C-alpha cells in the first residue's frame, strides 16, 4: 500500500458552497473507501455535530458513510475501522492538542502510511506536515508538541496570500514565513493558495487546482510553483 493524501488549502473558494470546489479532487480517493471518519477537533467555535453535518452535506454527492470521531466511545478503534480519514479546518493548535490528548497522532500516521486515504483542509492540511510552526492560527491552547503527522516531510501554509491591506502595518504572510526560514533554513515551506491542493500518491507529489503555490526555503523566498508541477523531490 502507498500513501494517498490530499491536502486542500481551504474548504471553499470565494463564495462557492462548502467543499464543492474540492469534489473533483476528493473523488479519486473515495473509489475504494466508503466508510470515513471525520475529525472535527479544529472546530473550536462550533458544535462538533453541526460541523459534521456540514461536511456530510458538502460531500453528499459522493454518497459516503461519514461519522464523527467524537461520536465513538473509542476514537482509536473508530479510526482503525474507517476506510479513510477526513480532518477539517479551524484552529490548528486545538486540533493538534486533541490529537495528542486522544493518542491519535502516531496512529493516524501509521494508518496513512499503510495506505488509508487522508483528506485535510486548512488546519487538517497544516497537521499533515512536519510541524504546525507555519500555521496562521492563534495559539489558543498549547499542545504537548508542535510536531505533527509528518505525512509530508516539510511545512505547509494553507490559505496562503501575501495581500497587504492599505494602511495596515503588520507583517505580510511572506514576511512571517521568511522568519521561519531564518530560524530553520533547511526545511521547505509550501504556501497553498485557496482553491489549490497538494496530492501525495506514494512517492509522487503534485499541485492541483487553479492557482500557483509558493516555496520558501533558505534564501529562496516566495518562489511560484505552477499548477501541475511535480513536487516529488520534496518527499526525499
Swiss-Prot record:
Pfam families: Peptidase_S51 (PF03575)
Subcellular location: Cytoplasm
One MF term in the entry's GO annotations: dipeptidase activity
Catalytic activity: Dipeptidase E catalyzes the hydrolysis of dipeptides Asp-|-Xaa. It does not act on peptides with N-terminal Glu, Asn or Gln, nor does it cleave isoaspartyl peptides
Chief localisation class: cytoplasm
Active site, per annotation: 122, 137, 159
GO biological process: proteolysis
Enzyme class per UniProt: hydrolase
Entry's EC annotation: 3.4.13.21
Claim: Hydrolase is one of the keywords in the record: yes
A single cellular component GO annotation: cytoplasm
Database matches in InterPro entries: Class_I_gatase-like, Peptidase_S51, Peptidase_S51_dipeptidase-E
Keyword terms: Cytoplasm, Dipeptidase, Hydrolase, Protease, Serine protease
Family per similarity comment: Belongs to the peptidase S51 family.
HAMAP family found in the cross-reference section: Peptidase_E
NCBIfam families noted in UniProt: PRK05282.1
Function: Hydrolyzes dipeptides containing N-terminal aspartate residues. May play a role in allowing the cell to use peptide aspartate to spare carbon otherwise required for the synthesis of the aspartate family of amino acids.
Name of protein: Peptidase E
Gene name per UniProt: pepE
Amino acid at each position: 500500500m502507498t500513501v494517498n493524501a490530499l491536502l486542500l488549502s481551504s474548504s471553499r473558494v470565494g463564495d462557492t458552497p462548502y467543499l464543492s470546489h474540492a469534489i473533483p479532487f476528493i473523488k479519486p480517493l473515495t473509489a475504494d473507501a466508503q466508510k470515513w471518519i471525520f475529525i472535527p477537533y479544529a472546530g473550536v467555535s462550533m458544535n462538533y455535530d453541526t460541523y459534521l453535518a456540514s461536511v456530510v452535506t458538502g460531500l453528499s454527492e459522493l454518497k459516503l458513510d461519514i461519522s464523527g470521531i467524537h461520536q465513538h466511545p473509542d476514537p482509536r478503534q473508530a479510526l482503525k475501522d474507517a476506510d479513510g480519514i477526513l480532518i477539517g479546518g479551524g484552529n490548528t493548535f486545538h486540533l493538534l492538542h486533541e490529537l495528542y490528548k486522544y493518542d491519535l497522532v502516531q496512529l493516524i500516521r501509521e494508518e496513512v502510511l499503510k495506505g488509508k486515504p487522508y483528506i485535510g483542509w486548512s488546519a487538517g492540511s497544516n497537521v499533515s506536515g512536519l510541524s504546525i510552526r507555519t500555521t496562521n492560527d492563534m495559539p489558543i491552547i498549547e499542545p504537548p508538541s508542535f510536531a505533527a503527522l509528518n505525512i509530508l516531510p516539510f511545512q505547509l501554509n494553507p490559505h496562503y496570500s501575501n495581500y497587504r491591506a492599505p494602511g495596515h502595518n503588520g507583517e505580510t504572510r511572506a514576511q512571517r514565513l521568511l522568519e521561519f526560514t531564518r530560524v530553520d533554513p533547511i526545511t521547505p515551506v509550501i504556501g497553498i493558495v485557496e482553491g489549490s491542493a497538494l496530492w501525495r500518491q506514494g512517492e509522487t507529489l503534485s499541485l492541483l487546482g487553479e492557482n500557483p503555490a509558493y516555496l520558501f526555503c533558505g534564501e529562496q523566498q516566495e518562489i511560484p510553483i505552477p499548477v501541475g508541477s511535480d513536487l516529488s523531490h520534496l518527499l526525499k
